[in-house]
Amino acid sequence: MEFRVHLQADNEQKIFQNQMKPEPEASYLINQRRSANYKPNIWKNDFLDQSLISKYDGDEYRKLSEKLIEEVKIYISAETMDLVAKLELIDSVRKLGLANLFEKEIKEALDSIAAIESDNLGTRDDLYGTALHFKILRQHGYKVSQDIFGRFMDEKGTLENHHFAHLKGMLELFEASNLGFEGEDILDEAKASLTLALRDSGHICYPDSNLSRDVVHSLELPSHRRVQWFDVKWQINAYEKDICRVNATLLELAKLNFNVVQAQLQKNLREASRWWANLGIADNLKFARDRLVECFACAVGVAFEPEHSSFRICLTKVINLVLIIDDVYDIYGSEEELKHFTNAVDRWDSRETEQLPECMKMCFQVLYNTTCEIAREIEEENGWNQVLPQLTKVWADFCKALLVEAEWYNKSHIPTLEEYLRNGCISSSVSVLLVHSFFSITHEGTKEMADFLHKNEDLLYNISLIVRLNNDLGTSAAEQERGDSPSSIVCYMREVNASEETARKNIKGMIDNAWKKVNGKCFTTNQVPFLSSFMNNATNMARVAHSLYKDGDGFGDQEKGPRTHILSLLFQPLVN
């Protein structure tokens, strides 16, 4: 179907303005409407207007950054540096949020390292060096076997006891073990034993307080599951304190780059904020979450690089719509209304909304207009054809999954865990986000590109599973209190007659298994140029879920933790 067929006339494209008021509803229906009691938005427009201004958005700082980049390139390309020092430098560059600036130099260095036989690396009997070597190569898509750790294991396949005395090597192997694939038993065993050993190490007095700090940070969440940009400030502060290996030029560049990128993000947030304010939807859907800034922070977590500005704004819009529609289904709509709304999205036809309350009509109209606009921009910028049907399909699937959950709620039905996850992975909205991501950052070219999403449904499923299960771990308590439809935790507890503690442990195990499958897919394809950005975005969506729901509901309660984190990420520059 031609894209233009889907576009309404200009007068039909106009978004409802702020002054639009919902038509009165019957009092009996108003009384049936639920409320999640979400708190008002804390990020006021006046605050955003005053705060989103940075002195680092200027040529002076960009020129200084370019000068420092050239100096660091020399360090990375130095042929006289020993292997472990080179690997540590590459590791630091990544942790400091600078890897995108040195892709060519890092690849050349790792190509040389990967060509060396493992027995000739000089790290044969060095657990730390071996683990660092394994981690860096696997992160960058090189083939490296878990068998290189065999020499550190006893006849039972567990880490030899004397290695537990070396905290630095233990920590690096723990981090490396989180990059494991399915069936890599050595890494599984190492992760299990090291998790316990590193926790116990907190009771021992180590002279290196920096190392003890790193242990606590990794046990809280391994670096592979952290959103890189969310962690950059912490890593810069940690690197600055590591006087044994700090590189002054690299540190200066890391601080400057953070501030320059933050200035770009602030410009993006201003643009997204204007879009959101002009819609006026927050004023008319009082029951729904007004979380523009949090949505933007999630988009930053998926792709922070300056060249992805338009994609970040696109993704912010999509995440906002996901939240609003989720609240329509969870809180506001009756079952009959939700069926009409689902039909409207499925048929992409506003006539299906004629019997709906004005606020639900408005919600559909915003979805319609925004999706058509995004499809047009993708077609113009990336050369794709027929994007709109792809986008409307994932929105329809999302709404159908939400409708199933609404029906479960109305019938007080608790599904089996398998039934719940089959639907819940769709209602997680990951497919919506990933399909928008795919078309936004890739370009039409080969048949392989066009078939990629279909051939990699397992990747989409496992990313969705990680997001869904993290969501349930963080929001289950609040949802049970509100009486929402059941989560995976409730389904598991009922299915096997387990305690909540046991259910949560099982859910975390499912997340671990899903990560192994994601690793197996991503680390074997991320050297393919046209896929590496998309693969990185896909795994970042899973990482955002870990961050968002680590301490509860990152969307529901802005004050509980997200506020401080967002202030640091988007508003507070680093002091040089």
Swiss-Prot record:
Mg(2+) 3 binds at N471, T475, E479. PANTHER family: ALPHA-FARNESENE SYNTHASE (PTHR31225:SF94), OS04G0344100 PROTEIN-RELATED (PTHR31225). This is (E,E)-alpha-farnesene synthase. Belongs to the terpene synthase family. Tpsb subfamily. GO terms for molecular function: alpha-farnesene synthase activity; magnesium ion binding; transferase activity. The activity enhancement by potassium is associated only with sesquiterpene synthase activity and not monoterpene or prenyltransferase activities. Mg(2+) 1 binds at D326, D330. It catalyses: (2E,6E)-farnesyl diphosphate = (3E,6E)-alpha-farnesene + diphosphate. SUPFAM superfamilies: Terpenoid cyclases/Protein prenyltransferases, Terpenoid synthases. GO terms for cellular component: cytoplasm. Its EC number is 4.2.3.46, 2.5.1.-. Induction: Up-regulated by ethylene. Inhibited by 1-methylcyclopropene (1-MCP). Changing R291G: In strain: cv. Idared. The Asp-Asp-Xaa-Xaa-Asp/Glu (DDXXD/E) motif is important for the catalytic activity, presumably through binding to Mg(2+).
